[in-house]
Regions:
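Conserved N-terminal phosphate-binding loop of PLP-dependent enzymes in the Aspartate aminotransferase
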Residues: 23-476
Length: 476
């Protein structure tokens, strides 16, 4: 790619203290890293460490591979950040964006206006999602979608005559975004420490069988884990609890897969206490679990749902809130003006790309492929890694997977310095040509839905080699 723009930079070799205009096309990797370190503050990173070592400069991608400025070709086992469901280089999405940019590159939805792509997308999402979710509010990220849903929920209960119902219950290790509101709903302690945890948010343990199941069978653990929600509702008071928010599979928390029956108990508890159930499908949506949404895979009926990532396969930013009929009916009839929205809500280019993306997923049968072929094959291919001396558990759900690393299988015994070993293993995987993510000491996979069996075999081969190198480095 050619960069015609010139920049004035004082941080590259050959620049004087006053800076010099430079073109970007001929920069070396080290110069790109220096320029990046000088000006770019990336998300979720240690700035000091990043500036010491330099960022990996990704230059281009095609199919299931990303390429960096050093010429390395890396199989993307994370689909970017859980989002590139249809793979890279899809000209259909590029062409959809180009056509829409030519016709209507932008107009807002504030002034009693709409546009054709967003209207068509709204109808399509109502068709694809579980019954009773027929209205859509658009934002730009999962964070914004979950922030929006919290506002809607509290507004709804005020209209119902229960303004005291404001408490949102989430789960430890839950991730619902990084705005103040969505981070408060999530259960990431580091995020709470850096930004004051907002009032009216509570958290319970997740159904993390690897840590909490012990000797219970699956049915016992499902009932016990759901009882943690009932107990917290009793502590807070059902008359104060507005909603329970949960990812069907907790992705950024480490691909925590609930036992069968867990959500059946959870939904019964919510109905009994008249508490709204919110499904955060930002990661699990658009085919990743073998149905369009994990709510369908798990037979859930959420009152509201958030989505992003796979909505456009990450090609452009877009998210959405699916509003259930009960909430939508009240907001429409009695809510008056809803004082919330974004400049880019329902952006016509994003909507056009989303429609083209959904057409690819449907036309290529990717949902069915995950359910009938690649999802089961991923589970089968990864299962032998559970015997590795460094692995305590392998868990998969559709095209989501986690390899839990342990110091010893007895117990199992976890590593004392949580996250260090995961980072070592991740680095070995990347050096070997596979992009994996480390969450604490779990190695995470969330590949494009277009992955083939050959891609899965390559993934397992590199992952096994990374495990071997990590164990050898640790002397295990």
């Amino acid at each position: 790619m050619s960069f015609g723009i010139k920049v004035k930079c004082r941080f590259l070799a050959g620049c004087n203290e006053h800076g010099a205009d430079m073109t970007l096309d001929e920069l070396s990797t080290r110069e790109w890293q220096a320029l990046d370190s000088a000006h770019h503050m990336a998300p979720f990173c240690d700035y000091g460490e990043l500036r010491q070592h330099g960022a990996r400069i990704i230059t281009h991608a095609e199919g299931h591979y990303i390429h960096d400025s050093e010429g390395n070709r890396i199989l993307d086992g994370m689909a970017g950040l859980w989002c590139v469901n249809v793979g890279y280089g899809r000209t259909e999405l590029v062409e959809a964006a180009s056509r829409q940019m030519t016709t209507l590159p932008y107009y807002n939805n504030f002034f009693k206006t709409s546009n054709r792509p967003v209207t068509a997308l709204s109808a399509k999402l109502a068709e694809l999602t579980p019954d009773g979710l027929n209205n859509v509010f658009y934002a730009n990220s999962g964070s914004e979608a979950n922030d929006t849903i919290i506002r809607m929920v509290r507004h709804f209960w005020a209209l119902e005559g229960h303004p005291e119902k404001r408490v949102i219950i989430g789960r430890d290790y839950g991730y619902h975004g990084s705005t103040i509101m969505s981070a408060s709903a999530g259960g990431m302690s580091g995020m709470h420490e850096q930004a004051a945890h907002e009032a009216d948010f509570e958290h319970i343990r997740p159904p993390y069988g690897f840590l909490y199941q012990g000797n219970q069978d699956e049915a016992q653990f499902a009932a016990n884990a759901a009882s943690w929600l009932a107990d917290r509702i009793a502590e807070v008071g059902a008359d104060r609890v507005a909603a329970f928010i949960a990812e069907p599979v907790q992705g950024a928390g480490g691909v925590i897969i609930p036992p069968r029956g867990y959500f059946e108990h959870v939904q019964e508890i919510c109905r009994r206490h008249d508490i709204l159930f919110i499904a955060d499908e930002v990661i699990t949506g658009f085919g990743r679990t073998g149905q369009w949404f994990a709510s369908q895979t798990m037979d859930l009926q959420p009152d509201m749902m958030t989505m992003a990532k796979g909505l456009t396969s990450g090609y452009v930013p877009m998210s959405a809130v699916m509003v259930g009929d009960r909430v939508a009916t009240r907001l429409i009839a009695d809510g008056g003006e809803f004082y919330h929205g974004f400049t880019y809500s329902g952006h016509p280019v994003a909507a056009a790309v989303a429609l083209a993306n959904l057409e690819i997923i449907e036309g290529e049968g990717l949902v069915e492929r995950v359910r009938q072929d690649t999802g089961p094959y991923l589970a089968e291919a990864l299962a032998p890694l559970a015997e590795h001396r460094l692995v305590g558990e392998v868990r998969t759900y559709g095209m989501l997977a986690a390899i839990e690393l342990v110091k010893s299988k007895d117990g199992p015994e976890l590593f004392a310095d949580t996250g260090t070993v995961g980072a070592i293993c991740r680095d070995h995987a990347i050096a070997g040509g596979l992009m994996m993510r480390a969450v604490r000491d779990a190695m995470i996979l969330s590949p494009p839905l277009t992955f083939t069996r050959d891609d899965i075999d390559e993934t397992v081969r590199i992952a096994r080699r990374a495990l071997d190198l990590t164990a050898d480095q640790l002397g295990l």
